[in-house]
Amino acid sequence: MDFDFRLLIVLLPILAAAGWAVFNIGVVAMQQFQKFLNK
């Protein structure tokens, strides 16, 4: 089975952007949650 590396080249930036967005949302959500707990 021959893997098409063009597919990887297309998907990699999309996956990187999605991962970065999820990471940032997670960080903000944790900060909000900690503020909520500290009230």
Swiss-Prot record:
The keyword Isomerase does not apply. GO terms for biological process: photosynthesis. GO terms for molecular function: manganese ion binding. It is a single-pass membrane protein. Its main location: membrane. InterPro entries: PSII_PsbY (IPR009388). Pfam families: PsbY (PF06298). Keywords: Membrane, Photosynthesis, Photosystem II, Thylakoid, Transmembrane, Transmembrane helix. GO terms for cellular component: photosystem II; plasma membrane-derived thylakoid membrane. The chain crosses the membrane at residues 7-25. It comes from the Bacteria. Disulfide bonds: none annotated. Belongs to the PsbY family. PSII is composed of 1 copy each of membrane proteins PsbA, PsbB, PsbC, PsbD, PsbE, PsbF, PsbH, PsbI, PsbJ, PsbK, PsbL, PsbM, PsbT, PsbX, PsbY, PsbZ, Psb30/Ycf12, peripheral proteins PsbO, CyanoQ (PsbQ), PsbU, PsbV and a large number of cofactors. It forms dimeric complexes. This is Photosystem II reaction center protein Y. It comes from Trichodesmium erythraeum (strain IMS101). The lineage of its organism: Bacteria, Bacillati, Cyanobacteriota, Cyanophyceae, Oscillatoriophycideae.
